[in-house]
């Protein structure tokens, strides 16, 4: 998503995101990733996010279909072999995932119809969806939001260029489940307007609240379940903190990272770990804010922030266009999926491995074309990565893949 407005598929493709060769393991220790540790399985025309179920001993993968929406599915994989054990049909495309393993429910963001899909992980059946918002006439919605002048002119010109009249005012990308409250938290990325946070009561199966105040392109989200905090990052260099119980915004911090696309919370160090994406979206952001945004970071970096203040504790370069990240608390390793390009014919994406305490880079593993999202076996034995196509692979009709990486104790 290069800006606030684009075609719906382009909007999501910038956010969400083959032979495998291990590159330059010289910096890695004996516990590094070796070629024989990597297994790849081609699965579907599109794969996006994953959730590992301990109770089911299964890996669930969202597999939306762009050509024929009714062919969208959730794939249930054997986590050891990556064999498909079940295909769960969906009526619409599902992208981001959150798992309530104790309740045997998988939740999916349905980015283009304003709903959250629900899947029973024991029966492998879709249970319908929870409605969050309806389509709006966008010009009317912008005027009702008080948008005028140059900003309104810019937005209307974009609508005309892409021939859009009605659409959903917010895009649903990431989703987090809070086991203590039974709530789902979903940033609603504003389609020309400031972003919001959707709160879903899963026990009642309905929308509980829509919370405003999340700025330009709210994208990243993570939970501090014990501390009862929700953290949301946006594309204007802010991290917003919400009380997970009262649903009150308790802090908005200006941070030294411009585009924190995804976040994870480190409870041991009370830190927020995030990837600063580094994609040029200046024109859209400046029109949205009404002034020229002054960049604070070079982008393509990993950040460690103090969760209380937003202060930078550490920052290191990763490879270009980082997307997903995952913290292995046991081994204190931070894994980052880097696309290394957007809409390129030949992708050369990588997985970078960092010491989570210091952010020292330990290893770089080639995972072309475009590694996207990550999941971990709770025992810490295996790391899973979705790998998306580049332009050439898409044109050739090749399926996208999931990679399993055997991990070793340090």
For the regions a protein language model found, what residue spans apply to each?
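Bacterial N-terminal signal peptides that target proteins for export
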Residues: 1-14
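Predominantly soluble domains enriched in secretory-pathway, periplasmic, or organellar proteins
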Residues: 5, 16, 20-410
């Amino acid at each position: 998503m290069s800006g606030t407005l684009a075609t719906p598929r382009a909007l999501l493709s910038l956010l969400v995101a083959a032979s495998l060769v291990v590159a330059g393991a010289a910096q890695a220790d004996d516990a590094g990733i070796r070629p024989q540790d990597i297994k790849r399985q081609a699965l579907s025309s599109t794969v996006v996010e994953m959730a590992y179920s301990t109770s089911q001993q299964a890996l669930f993968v969202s597999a939306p279909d762009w050509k024929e929406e009714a062919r969208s599915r959730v794939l249930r994989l054997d986590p050891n072999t990556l064999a498909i054990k079940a295909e769960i049909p969906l009526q619409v495309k599902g992208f981001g995932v959150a798992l309530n393993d104790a309740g045997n429910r998988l939740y999916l963001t349905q980015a283009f119809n304003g709903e959250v899909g629900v899947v029973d992980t024991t029966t492998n059946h879709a249970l319908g969806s929870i409605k969050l918002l309806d389509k709006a006439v966008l010009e009317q919605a912008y005027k009702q939001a008080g948008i005028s002048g140059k900003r309104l002119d810019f937005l209307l010109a974009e609508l005309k260029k892409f021939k859009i009249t009605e659409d959903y005012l917010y895009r649903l990308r990431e989703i987090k489940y809070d086991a203590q409250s039974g709530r789902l938290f979903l940033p609603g990325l504003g389609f020309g307007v400031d972003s919001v946070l959707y709160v879903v009561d899963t026990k009642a199966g309905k929308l509980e609240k829509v919370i405003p105040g999340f700025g330009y392109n709210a994208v990243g989200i993570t939970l501090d379940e014990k501390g009862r905090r929700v953290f949301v990052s946006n594309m204007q260099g802010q991290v917003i903190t919400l009380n997970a119980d009262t649903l009150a915004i308790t802090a908005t911090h200006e941070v030294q990272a411009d585009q924190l696309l995804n976040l994870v919370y480190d409870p041991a160090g009370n830190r927020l770990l995030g990837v600063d994406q580094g994609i040029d979206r200046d024109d859209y952001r400046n029109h949205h804010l009404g002034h020229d945004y002054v960049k604070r970071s070079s982008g393509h970096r990993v950040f460690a922030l103090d969760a209380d203040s937003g202060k930078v504790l550490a920052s290191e370069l990763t490879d270009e266009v980082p997307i997903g990240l995952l913290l292995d608390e046991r081994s204190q390793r931070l894994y980052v999926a880097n696309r290394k390009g957007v809409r390129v014919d030949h992708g050369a994406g990588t997985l970078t491995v960092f010491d989570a305490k210091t952010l020292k880079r330990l290893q770089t593993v080639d995972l072309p074309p475009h590694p996207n999202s990550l999941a971990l076996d709770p025992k810490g034995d295996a790391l899973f990565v979705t790998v998306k196509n580049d332009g050439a692979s898409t044109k050739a009709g090749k399926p996208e893949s999931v990679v399993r990486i055997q991990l070793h104790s340090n």
